[in-house]
């Protein structure tokens, strides 16, 4: 009986101690966004690469969600694994299967070529657009890294966009393009109203309804300058539902929906002396 009384007498004191400790454990939950990117090494020259290599979330994709989703379905998104699975893989191939100085305006080792880091695996946004760090730190229209549309002199120009990788004995697409009618601009039709849609790259993009910006755009039209029908005029670099990332299918029985026929359809009967 005395023991029970002693326990009861201690109960108020115990409750006071518990209340005091409860007051000391008051918590405020602070939510923090995850970091959008890891600060790149100085030698990477401003290339940021992946936020998460495992999930293949590019830093750019944190904001440009639809572009990330399109890119996910392209061969560029799996370029590193494609190389590793090839029995002919060589170290010198890595620059075209990663974010590096190839495919953009950078002229010295950058990204994977400079650091060897996994965050630069695959052909990501920056492979064509160039370093994105400045835009990530200060996202405004003046810091947007623009991709190149021109292919230029594929045999000698070091800054030739797509042609820096899609070239050579392995896949001579740039050489084939340069030898085709698409590789040159015929000044006469290019400068005529009604002809520019099929004789200039900028005109074709406008006809296709593509509203975009690129490095050369500001200079086009000045002093008769026009862009040829380059790779990205017919192929969507961000991806598409058509084969080879084409902007339109090539088997649609429609002048409005067939990529080639939108231009190559102006004669009543075939003429082997002209591309049209």
Each PLM stretch: what is its role?
Residues 2-11:
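Bacterial N-terminal signal peptides that target proteins for export
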Residues 12-13, 245:
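Enrichment for repetitive, rod-forming helical segments
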Residues 19-23:
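C-terminal motif of bacterial Sec signal peptides marking the signal peptidase cleavage site
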């Amino acid at each position: 009986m005395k023991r029970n009384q002693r326990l009861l007498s201690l109960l108020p004191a115990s409750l006071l101690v518990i209340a005091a400790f409860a007051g000391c454990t008051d918590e405020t939950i602070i939510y923090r966004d995850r970091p959008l990117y890891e600060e790149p090494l100085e030698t990477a020259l401003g290339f940021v690469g992946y936020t998460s290599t495992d999930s293949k979330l590019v830093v750019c994709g944190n904001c440009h969600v639809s572009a990330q989703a399109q890119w996910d379905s392209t061969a560029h998104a799996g370029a590193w694994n494609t190389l590793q699975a090839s029995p002919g893989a060589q170290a010198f191939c890595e620059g075209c299967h990663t974010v590096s100085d190839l495919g953009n305006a950078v002229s010295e080792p950058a990204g994977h070529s400079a650091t060897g880091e996994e965050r630069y695996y695959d052909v990501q946004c920056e492979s064509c657009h160039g370093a994105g760090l400045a835009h990530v730190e200060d996202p405004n229209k003046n810091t947007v890294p623009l991709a190149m549309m021109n292919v230029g002199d594929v045999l000698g120009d070091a800054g030739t966009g797509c042609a820096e990788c899609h070239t050579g004995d392995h896949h001579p697409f740039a050489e084939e393009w340069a030898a085709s009618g698409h590789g040159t601009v015929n000044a006469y039709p290019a400068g005529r109203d009604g002809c520019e849609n099929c004789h200039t790259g900028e005109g074709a993009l406008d006809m296709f309804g593509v509203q975009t910006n690129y490095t050369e755009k500001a200079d086009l039209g000045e002093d008769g300058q026009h862009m040829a029908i380059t790779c990205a005029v017919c192929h969507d670099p961000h991806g598409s539902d058509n084969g080879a990332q084409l902007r339109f299918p090539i088997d649609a029985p429609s002048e409005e929906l067939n990529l080639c026929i939108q231009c190559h359809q102006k004669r009543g009967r075939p003429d082997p002396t002209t591309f049209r």
